[in-house]
Amino acid sequence: MKKENFLRQFPKEMEYLASKLYNSYEVAKEYEIMGFTEEFYTPNFWKKLGKRMDGLNVICDGVFADSDRRQIAFVPDSFIAGNRDVYDNFAKNGKSLVQDNEKIEDYTDFNNEFNENSFQFPNKLLKISIDSRFREYLHKDFLGSLMGLNIKRELMGDLILENEGRKISGYIPVSEKITDYIISELKQIGKASCEIEIIDTKNKNILPQYKYDDKLITVPSKRLDSIVSTITNLSRTKVIEPIEKGKVLVDYVEEKDKSRMVEIGSLITIRGFGKYKLFLDKGETKKGKERILVKKYI
C-alpha cells in the first residue's frame, strides 16, 4: 500500500502518528520482520486496520482486556505459519514456535497463543501507588503528573485506578523506552509521594479491569446528537453547541457532525460528562425506537 493512500484514511491532524504507524508496516513488509509501534494507538487507528493488511497480520496489545489504547505489530505469515527453520530461528528465551515438532498448517488458533505468549510487545506495565487517606485522587492527577515529565500521551496506554486500602494505585502500560525515565523521575502524584513498580503481565487474570455503570437507553436512531442528548439528559437543541465546538469525541476524534451515525462498539467522550461505550444493540421497541446498552467508564 502506498503511503499517501494509507494516510488518507486518517484525519489530517493525526498525520504524524499515522506516518509512524506506516513506517512500522513498511519495515515489516520490506524486510519480512515483525514491526512494532512504540506508540499506543486509539480505536480510530486500529479499527481501520482490521486483522490483516496487505499480506501482514495485524496484532494489537494494550495489556488490559478491552483496552482502548494499543500498540500495534505487523507480523509476516512466516512468523506464524512458516517452515520449521523460521520457527527455530525465531526461538525466544529457549522457546520455539513449533508445536509438537510439526509445522503449523492451520494457524488460526495458534495466532492467539502466539500473540499472548510468544513475543513481548515493547511495553511495561507500571503500578504507581500513593497514600489516598487525605484527599481523593483522579485519573487527571496521575496523567497530569506523568505528562508533566514532558512525556507524550501516545507513549502511554490506558490508565486504570484501583483503591487498595489506604492507597490508590494507577496501573498504566508505557512504552519500554520511557520506563526507566519514569521510574527515575516521577516522585509524586500531585503533592503525594509515590511508589512505582513494574508488574508482570503474563497472568492476564490478575490484571485490573475496567469498571462500568450500565445504562439502557432508547433513541430514535444512532445519530450522534440523539445519543448524546439521551446520555446527558439534555435536549437535542442544547447538545448541538458542544458538538459543533468539538467537545464530543467519537473514538478519540472530535466529531462536529451532529447527524453522524454511530456504530455499536464506538467510544463517545463528552467533555464534562465522561466516556461511554455503545456496547450492545438490544433491538427495537414496539414504536420502532432503538434500544442500546451503554457502558459508562467509572
Description of each model-found segment:
Residues 245-253:
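Short, structured beta-strand/loop micro-motifs enriched in basic residues and often containing a Trp
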